[in-house]
Amino acid sequence: MQAKAVTKYVRISPTKVRPVMDLVRGKPVDRALAILRYLPHKAAREIARTIESARANATNNYDMAPDALIVKYIFADEGPAFKRIMPRARGRADRIRKRTTHITVIVDDGEEM
């Protein structure tokens, strides 16, 4: 059985989030959280929050054992970008895109329905 958690509009670029996700994909939830706890990335904190939410969804909504959960799927989709303007020389301006990310985590206990 699977449980899912999504964190939307995280103010980090998806390209910065994906390498951190690769470290925990396929690992048990407890081990994944231990790995993320010691990483010096902002993305690690956001991913850990989403994994904890998925674990809580699994235990409260589906009565799964929290010790048996594995991070089955984890991915980052691109959210909307905030558009900002950076003034440049001679009256010009450049557009800055502050990117956002939607983090999705699906945990599984390995049992079929």
Swiss-Prot record:
Function: This protein binds specifically to 23S rRNA; its binding is stimulated by other ribosomal proteins, e.g. L4, L17, and L20. It is important during the early stages of 50S assembly. It makes multiple contacts with different domains of the 23S rRNA in the assembled 50S subunit and ribosome. The globular domain of the protein is located near the polypeptide exit tunnel on the outside of the subunit, while an extended beta-hairpin is found that lines the wall of the exit tunnel in the center of the 70S ribosome.
Species for this entry: Roseiflexus sp. (strain RS-1)
SUPFAM superfamilies given in the database record: Ribosomal protein L22
Cysteine-cysteine disulfides: none
Protein name (Swiss-Prot/TrEMBL): Large ribosomal subunit protein uL22
Isomerase recorded as keyword: no
GO BP terms: translation
Entry similarity comment: Belongs to the universal ribosomal protein uL22 family.
